[in-house]
Amino acid sequence: MKTIFSGIQPSGTLTLGNYLGAIQQFVELQNDYNCYFCIVDEHAITVPQDRLELRKNIKSLAALYIASGIDPDSSTLFIQSEVPEHTQLGWMLQSISYVGELERMTQYKDKSQGQEAISSALLTYPSLMAADILLYNTDVVPVGDDQKQHLELARNLAQRFNNRFNDIFTVPEVRIPKVGARIMSLQEPTKKMSKSDTNQKGFISMLDEPKRIEKKIKSAVTDSEGIVKFDKENKPGVSNLLTIYSSCTGESIADLEKKYDGKGYGDFKQGVANAVIDTLRPIQEKYEQLIQSDELDAILDQGRDKASFSAGKTIKKAKKAMGLGRK
């Protein structure tokens, strides 16, 4: 069985876009792959964080993943900072990373632009990301297009280490998922839905209550045509709502177009709101149970132990290959 690794930053509540675009696919992937889902809290501190908020976000993210269907018995869900081999290997890989290639990373350029004081961790972030992946002999990494450059570096570092020292690491395959809906902002439907959107009406949080979801969908940008039809170029708002509706219910977009033929946007938006509320309700109920119980800590302890066992074996081989320690 091939291994998949996915890292998730604990930076606030996940959106409906995260769920329909990625988590749903992860739930399906765990049946066919050995999956590691890592809450990358050490990556989060490359920018300033409030410690209490960070702790809260870590637990909230873990609870949402489990509530969404990630099975802690068939997958490994854990917190990065609880497995010290990540930073150990991150440092070892920094020793074979070149400053020039790290400075070329688009995300580093974007995040450091206009900043007077830039954290060195922001520069070396990709070396730690490579360590996250290589520790588990990962075969496949499903990532968005924005992370492809970092993944190419992880591949290069694996090959560089293997050539220079010993053939330790599996060179991972980068997979940009073709499945999974790309959900756009409700207010600017040409932009991806994001939790960092300054306009709160632009995104639906996975923990939004039903009335709030309904209000956001009813205020979603459409057009003046009044026809429910999928046309991404000319009707981005309506097309986005159709994608959301279809992803939540499993009904095809063609069937939904027929269903709302001759009906206005009011009826259509109500249908979308109901579909989203029905999709998120069981997840929210499970989340509330988990966040209040000791079960979540037990699951994260189990995940830490499983991850540590695999990571420990890899780091031992890597240290030996580099000549670190006594034996």
Swiss-Prot record:
It catalyses: tRNA(Trp) + L-tryptophan + ATP = L-tryptophyl-tRNA(Trp) + AMP + diphosphate + H(+). One of its GO terms (cellular component) is cytosol. It is found in: Cytoplasm. InterPro entries: aa-tRNA-synth_I_CS, aa-tRNA-synth_Ic, Rossmann-like_a/b/a_fold, Trp-tRNA-ligase, Trp-tRNA-ligase_bac-type, Trp-tRNA_synthetase. Pfam families: tRNA-synt_1b. One of its GO terms (molecular function) is ATP binding. ATP binds at residues 9-11, 17-18, 144-146, 183, 192-196. A motif ('KMSKS' region) lies at residues 192-196. Its main location: cytoplasm. Catalyzes the attachment of tryptophan to tRNA(Trp). NCBIfam families: trpS. Belongs to the class-I aminoacyl-tRNA synthetase family. This is Tryptophan--tRNA ligase. It comes from Oceanobacillus iheyensis (strain DSM 14371 / CIP 107618 / JCM 11309 / KCTC 3954 / HTE831). The gene is trpS.
